[in-house]
Amino acid sequence: MWGSQHRSFQVALWFLVLAVFLLVGFLHVDFRLLIPDKVQEPPVTNIMFLKTHKTASSTILNILYRFSESHNLSTALPEGSRVHLGYPWFFVTRYVEGLKQDAHLQHHFNIMCNHLRFNYPEVQKVMPRDTFYFSILRNPVFQLESSFIYYKDYAPAFQRAKSLDEFLADPWKYYNASVSLKNVYAKNNMWFDFGFDNNAPADMDYVRKRLAEVEQRFHLVLIADYFDESMVLLRRRLRWQLDDVVSFKLNVRSQSTVSHLTPESQERVQHWCALDWQLYQHFNRTFWTQLHAELSPRQLTEEVEQLRERQRELMALCLQDPEPKNLTHIDDQNLRPYQGGKANILGYNLRHGLDTTTLHICQRMAMPELQHMAHMYSLQFPDKTPKDIPFLKK
């Protein structure tokens, strides 16, 4: 009798220990890892991307063009010989090819992603009501440094300054707000792209209202300084497949043209581009808040590595060398990028002997922005005169 009770006690004790063990494990489970991706839901196909300047936005444009072509979607492309949607003027519908000019007509496209100065009422005439709006920002220190090199010969504010350090030491010596349409690249350029006054005082009440406006109209603002993390979040929001957001870096400069600003100059950028700085600071915070709400740290690490691994696989499949090349070392002129200002923009060489399907994929991943835009234009408007890319004829 006593032996039977003893055995029953041992069994009960064993089950109690097991229950405690399972409970501890249960409490430490990250349930977000157990929730599968919503791959069964249809992908988002109505998308407006505000393409800001010098923010890795050319790479995102490539991603959107590829998705548009592979899913047979319509894209709001620049009209006629234009390469932008009216920039730096405010966007209006007449800048879009194939859009009949009728005050009462709304012609909806699936994707809009070329450079424009944001004008929400006009964009609404082009895009469907359920459009997903997103954009991307970059640390203004690095954004302005890139702009200085790229627009050195175009922006009057940059032309006489020997370096960005020299410009920032006394910017009003070089900057004239009255020629703002050419000088937008020299002061609060991202703020300007969102449709705001880049010369406005950085008054807190004004800034707060404009930030609230951006939050109201845009579902997501990405951060170029964390590009891979941005692609992970974008993929989840759009419910796309991994390959849809894998990319090769486009419109990148050689390191020899990158300036390293002094600490004093970096601090001066925060004051000179105060509107851009507050825009960036605000949406850098919201980006990480959204990212951490969506993924656990472990899940984020895994998905970023998954993205990078797939990029390495495609680079090995497509490219002769994963390192981008100078213009003179790019064999195919259709893969030679436009050269802006003092920047040395790099591109890629594809492997020889690729089969037709692989070549199709690789060409589009490596295709520079202007050539890709011309390609999309020919696909969508085969009866119209093809886009002219003058620098390819040199």
Swiss-Prot record:
Membrane topology per record: Single-pass type II membrane protein
Main location: Golgi
InterPro entries on file: Gal-3-0_sulfotransfrase, P-loop_NTPase
SUPFAM superfamilies for this protein: P-loop containing nucleoside triphosphate hydrolases (SSF52540)
Record GO terms (molecular function): galactose 3-O-sulfotransferase activity; galactosylceramide sulfotransferase activity
Highest rank taxon of the organism: Eukaryota
Keyword Glycoprotein: yes
Subcellular location(s) of the protein: Golgi apparatus, Golgi stack membrane
GO cellular component, one term: Golgi cisterna membrane
Keyword Glycoprotein included in the entry's annotation: yes
Glycan-modified residues: 72, 176, 284, 326
Keywords: Glycoprotein, Golgi apparatus, Membrane, Signal-anchor, Transferase, Transmembrane, Transmembrane helix
Residues in compartment: Cytoplasmic: 1-8
Entry-linked Pfam families: Gal-3-0_sulfotr
Topological region Lumenal: 30-394
Pathway linked to the protein: Protein modification; carbohydrate sulfation
Description of activity control: Strongly inhibited by Cu(2+) and Zn(2+).
GO terms (BP aspect): glycolipid biosynthetic process; glycoprotein biosynthetic process; sulfation
Known EC number: 2.8.2.-
Listed transmembrane segments: 9-29
Role this protein plays: Transfers a sulfate group to the hydroxyl group at C3 of non-reducing beta-galactosyl residues. Acts both on type 1 (Gal-beta-1,3-GlcNAc) and type 2 (Gal-beta-1,4-GlcNAc) chains with similar efficiency.
Family assignment from sequence similarity: Belongs to the galactose-3-O-sulfotransferase family.
Name of the protein this chain belongs to: Galactose-3-O-sulfotransferase 2
Source species of the chain: Mus musculus (Mouse)
Source lineage: Eukaryota, Metazoa, Chordata, Craniata, Vertebrata
